[in-house]
From Swiss-Prot:
Purpose of the protein: This enzyme is involved in nucleotide metabolism: it produces dUMP, the immediate precursor of thymidine nucleotides and it decreases the intracellular concentration of dUTP so that uracil cannot be incorporated into DNA.
Protein name as annotated: Deoxyuridine 5'-triphosphate nucleotidohydrolase
Keywords from the named record: Hydrolase, Magnesium, Metal-binding, Nucleotide metabolism
EC number(s) per entry: 3.6.1.23
One function term, GO molecular function aspect: magnesium ion binding
Hydrolase among keywords: yes
Length: 152
């Protein structure tokens, strides 16, 4: 299934010096987002930086949203994750896409212009309609919370 997304290029290096967002493989769920920086950016341990992706998107339909997610290799190997953990892009947002990068590692890390820093995933959205009730239908789990379903 595909969904047409309008993309506005805000940094003219995208599409020439830096590739446009693309799926790395046929099975990829996320499109790589790149750092549109003018020079390398060193992120010290425990520091966060807001980095431009050089683009804006318009999803155009209320039944979709996009998420900005971390790249697993950056987090696992270098401690670079998203400062807000997950970025949510609403269907009617049209502004620039920015990535909050947080160095939770013990060493400084340098992001270079054009580096892949996050991934964008477009998702279908179901709108909730609440039905107020006095009691829920009983389930096996019930109100069991954290850890109540066991470890294995």
């Amino acid at each position: 299934m595909t969904h047409s997304v309008q993309l506005k290029i805000l940094d003219k290096r995208l599409g020439s010096e830096f590739p446009l967002p693309a799926y790395a493989t046929k099975g990829s769920a996320g499109l790589d987002l790149r750092a549109c920086l003018d020079e390398p950016l060193k992120i010290e341990p425990d520091e966060t930086c807001l980095i431009s992706t050089g683009l804006a998107i318009y999803l155009g339909h209320s039944n979709v949203a996009a998420t900005i997610l971390p790249r697993s290799g950056l987090g696992h190997k270098h401690g670079i994750v998203l400062g807000n953990l997950v970025g949510l892009i609403d269907s009617d947002y049209q502004g620039p896409l920015m990535v909050s990068c947080w160095n939770r590692g013990k060493e400084p890390y340098t992001i270079n212009p054009g580096d892949r820093i996050a991934q964008l995933v477009v998702l279908p959205i179901l709108k909730a309609q609440f039905a107020v009730v006095e009691e829920f239908e009983l389930t096996e789990r019930g109100a069991g919370g954290f850890g109540s379903s066991g470890q294995n």
